[in-house]
Amino acid sequence: MKRNPTKSGSQSSRMEPADAEKQLQSFIAKFEPKNQTLIRAVRKALRKRFPTANELAYDNYNFFALGYCSTERPADCVVSIAASANGVGLSFYWGATLPDPHGILLGSGNQNRFIRLESAKVLERREVLELIAAAEAQAKIPMPASGGGKLIIRSVSAKQKSRRASAK
């Protein structure tokens, strides 16, 4: 039995690019202004680093995520922006297998690792650039040599945690 992509929440590549961008901006607008600015700055830096990558967007219960992939499959993501009310991070889908001689990766699961991003400048640090290069090098399917990637809205959850920090 084939899965119905609409039921799974995937809007895949059927959405017009302008509509996908508008929807993505609405996801980002849910965050506090400082996190909106950070998400946009990190996205700009990652688009520059991976100009041919597809961007897979998820607005799920716990996190907003934007993955940079060689295909339309989440497992092919090299890195992702992951954001919640607690801040913004750079997630490595296969981070548990990456060399981390500087010990900057956080997380303890079998697969994913991440770093916290206080600013987009963190992406310029040598140890972060090394992790990104290692993640790209271990990708099963390399990024296309040419062309432009597309923005794909993969999943939107009706119920979500707040994207803004709660008042204390």
Feature-to-residue mapping (PLM):
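Charge-dense, helix-prone N-terminal extensions
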Residues: 1-168
